[in-house]
Amino acid sequence: MGASPVQLLIVLFIAVLVFGGKRLRTLGSDVGAAIKGFKEAMKEEPTEPEKLEQQPPVIEVVATQKEKTKG
């Protein structure tokens, strides 16, 4: 049950009437730029989390000696 080409043209015509042609062009270019930026961000390799995972955990401990009491 997909949309037929006639139905898509009607929806496009209504969108042009509501928003106007210029606004639809700018909206389309903005959406395209956002998708492009998202794809580029997904291709970049994460650097910080890998560095943190490679370092072993450090546990700091302070040792104290307890004195014996005679009682």
From Swiss-Prot:
NCBIfam families: tatAE. One of its GO terms (cellular component) is TAT protein transport complex. The gene is tatA. It comes from Dichelobacter nodosus (strain VCS1703A). One of its GO terms (biological process) is protein transport by the Tat complex. The Tat system comprises two distinct complexes: a TatABC complex, containing multiple copies of TatA, TatB and TatC subunits, and a separate TatA complex, containing only TatA subunits. Substrates initially bind to the TatABC complex, which probably triggers association of the separate TatA complex to form the active translocon. The keyword Nucleotide-binding does not apply. It comes from the Bacteria. The chain crosses the membrane at residues 1-21. Its main location: membrane. Keywords: Cell inner membrane, Cell membrane, Membrane, Protein transport, Translocation, Transmembrane, Transmembrane helix, Transport. It is a single-pass membrane protein. Belongs to the TatA/E family. This is Sec-independent protein translocase protein TatA. One of its GO terms (molecular function) is protein transmembrane transporter activity. Part of the twin-arginine translocation (Tat) system that transports large folded proteins containing a characteristic twin-arginine motif in their signal peptide across membranes. TatA could form the protein-conducting channel of the Tat system. It is found in: Cell inner membrane.
